Design a protein with these regions (language model features):
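Domain-level recognition of nuclease-like catalytic cores that cleave nucleotide substrates
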Residues: 72-126
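A short acidic/basic microdomain associated with nuclease active sites
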Residues: 3-33
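Conserved RecA-like P-loop NTPase helicase motor core
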Residues: 62-66, 74-76
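Short, solvent-exposed loop/turn segments that connect beta-strands within catalytic domains
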Residues: 33-41, 83-86
Length: 126
């Protein structure tokens, strides 16, 4: 993805890997769009790699960030990333463009009250 951003004109020193920070995206890049006005082009990029034709999954945090950051949030999907001809697809504002197509899959862990009571044991004085 760094190579793609470099090809798009983003300076290497202005491309950051931020995935470990749990910000809702993997890369942050910025560049001067217009030197006269000082306008800056900012991209917050979530990267997904999947076999061609397979759905991608965004975390709740990633989806909410896509909604919040709108035009500055980009989804980069690499189809067949381990194949001979990986194909990069870029989508600016994925929330705005894909909200109609998303399917929400909610996962949680339900623990019965009885199990909680049984596992709690006696309360010991401090």
């Amino acid at each position: 993805m760094i190579a793609a951003l470099l090809e798009e004109g983003f300076p290497a020193e202005r491309i950051e890997r931020v995935g470990a920070l749990k910000l809702g995206f993997d890369l942050r890049a910025h560049r001067v769009r217009d030197a006269v006005t000082g306008e800056i082009d900012v991209r917050r990029i979530e990267v997904k790699g999947r076999m061609r034709g397979q759905p991608i999954r965004l975390t709740t945090n990633e989806w909410y960030k896509a909604q919040q950051l709108a035009e500055t949030y980009w989804l980069y999907v690499v189809w067949d990333p381990l194949g001979h001809l990986p194909d990069l697809v870029r989508i600016q504002d994925p929330f705005g463009k894909l909200d109609h197509a998303k399917r929400e899959v909610v996962r949680f862990f339900e623990i019965p009250a009885k199990a909680i009571i049984e596992a709690s044991g006696p309360i010991l004085p401090e």
